């Protein structure tokens, strides 16, 4: 029975399997299917625990966020995704993609198309600064923002879309907080 249970549990879409004998000549097999929570790389699937359960598939639900990172980093990237996602949902946003590169640098793409560069050092501090900037500075001009670079020690930079809206951003668009820093 154990060998059968291990074989069934080893199938790609099987999260858990239980095999028991029903006397006299019946096997009872109970299977729980994996539920994909995110894409991994180009064609893999992660479950909610951050476990890569399919390495290559042709059918990937389009609504799943795309996570990526070095081999073996699936759980770390998934945990970071969950932590960031919770804070973004409060603001009506989500994560379209989150990546950890081979040097340990984090980048993400928000559901509204804004890219965010977090780098590899002090990521939690940079994320806190990003959420503060998102609420107070970026949100009012989000339609014109292409990327926010948080890799600076005491600030951040904004990369604007090439095709800016008809009106340009003025000092009046920015909150008093940023103007007071210039004084």
Predicted regions and their residues:
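Charged, solvent-exposed interaction patches on well-folded alpha/beta domains
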Residues: 3-10, 16-183
